[in-house]
Amino acid sequence: MSLFDTINAGGAQLLGVAWPTVWALVRILVVAVVILLCVAYLILWERKLIGWMHVRLGPNRVGPAGLLQPIADVLKLLLKEVIQPTAASRWLYLIAPIMTVVPAFAVWAVIPFQAEAVLANVNAGLLYAMAISSIGVYAVILAGWASNSKYAFLGAMRAAAQMVSYEISMGFALVLVLMTAGSLNLSEIVNSQQHGFFAGHGVNFLSWNWLPLLPAFVVYFISGIAETNRHPFDVVEGESEIVAGHMIDYSGMAFALFFLAEYINMIVISALAATLFLGGWDAPFEFLSFIPGIFWLVLKVFALLSVFIWVRATFPRFRYDQIMRLGWKVFLPVTVIWVVVVGFWMMSPLNIWVK
């Protein structure tokens, strides 16, 4: 019996019919706290990694090796005043930051950490993740409009166009995963990647979706960078043009909530990419399968997040027209063509996804 089963059985005996509700709340709280800690130290890792790329040390003053820097940053933001522009729409202005964070947290309900370790193992998990993650664009538009600022509204309009443009390509990439796995359940998608010729010979990583669906994987990940408005797709903020985009009139914790949502969405994109294309909790080689699955998932997510940071430190910002051209004239045709190719592939004698 696993640790979770032991806790579940003991709690059921102690609290009776109230236990399922209490257990669900405890799991949600644990996941939320872990995500917040991950965001705090992801920001530190980003600053450290970019510092090393610049031949600098990065943050190293607060605590040993700078490990307490995230706590200092949080305290600083908590103590700052939330200043509201006089011309802003009060309630919409305050609701917008909350609306960005809530969908980012909600997606984690369906992401499996390892076999049988998921908050809600729903059959339409992939559809749920896509639907919930697309809600964030409304909060960005709301923030730009409620601030009653031309700069903020311009940033919000850019964000809306950019996010909608790349969601279409991401959607087609996920259709390919649905076609090959035959399920919208994220746990079943991971299980579908554990079969095949290479998996049968102990080389699991060659059976994952990244290899046969490589164009979709590349499109999904780059579109994820654009969806989170990260460099080189950060024309929404565009420091040299419109300063901070839709966040220009926010301060204190209201400002911090936008960045919290951005970094949570980075982790979500990486976790979904690892789940859909990199085998989720599956070990790369069969002889390593004794290591808990959550270790492999965390390792894959960490690697993808490091790519996010590497891209930020390496590439210059694209012009707005270049971003639109990439989404509509490159990524969309590539994913549509690959859907057709995989469809014919699955109907041919060379079908590698036969269960």
Swiss-Prot record:
NCBIfam families: PRK06076.1-2, PRK06076.1-3. This is NADH-quinone oxidoreductase subunit H. It catalyses: a quinone + NADH + 5 H(+)(in) = a quinol + NAD(+) + 4 H(+)(out). One of its GO terms (biological process) is aerobic respiration. Pfam families: NADHdh (PF00146). NDH-1 shuttles electrons from NADH, via FMN and iron-sulfur (Fe-S) centers, to quinones in the respiratory chain. The immediate electron acceptor for the enzyme in this species is believed to be ubiquinone. Couples the redox reaction to proton translocation (for every two electrons transferred, four hydrogen ions are translocated across the cytoplasmic membrane), and thus conserves the redox energy in a proton gradient. This subunit may bind ubiquinone. PROSITE patterns: COMPLEX1_ND1_2. The lineage of its organism: Bacteria, Pseudomonadati, Pseudomonadota, Betaproteobacteria, Burkholderiales. Belongs to the complex I subunit 1 family.
